[in-house]
């Protein structure tokens, strides 16, 4: 299974504004946000992902299937042990999008990402979504295969 989600940016009404959109966004499980930065973690493409704004004005997170699978497994095992598990763990299926800055190290003219920090600079963007969304809904694209027997 492969899954992808894109978040369309809504352009500012003030194009000459000094406030720019975040260069990078981190997708991380809501319950893991504080420990992600406290423990200096990096996006691992399993439970956390990062992306930049692309040429079509979107932040696209590709192949998030491992995250979906981990969340589903946590719910499955949690519910097997405790029927009230989802009530006790209301964020089991929640992620946050957080602006980040990448720390890099350069060696022999090759830059390598050495860390991720919560972006504390002035940046802002508005993404399509929410209950009052006048735009097309956010779609999660899922591709999977199944063998016929």
Residue ranges and their predicted role:
Residues 1-149:
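Secreted, disulfide-rich extracellular signaling modules
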């Amino acid at each position: 299974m492969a899954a992808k989600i894109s978040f369309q940016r809504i352009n500012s009404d003030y194009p000459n504004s000094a406030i720019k959109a975040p260069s990078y966004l981190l997708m991380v499980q809501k319950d893991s946000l504080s420990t992600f930065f406290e423990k200096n973690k990096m996006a691992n493409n399993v439970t956390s992902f990062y992306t930049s704004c692309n040429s079509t004005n979107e932040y696209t997170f590709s192949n998030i299937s491992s995250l979906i699978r981990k969340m589903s497994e946590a719910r499955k095992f949690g519910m097997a042990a405790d029927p009230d598990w989802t009530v006790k763990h209301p964020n089991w299926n929640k992620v946050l999008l957080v602006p980040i800055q990448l720390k890099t190290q350069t060696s022999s003219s090759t830059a390598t990402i050495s860390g991720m920090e919560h972006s504390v600079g002035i940046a802002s963007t508005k993404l399509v979504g929410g209950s009052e969304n006048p735009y097309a809904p956010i779609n999660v694209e899922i591709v999977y295969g199944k063998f016929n027997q």
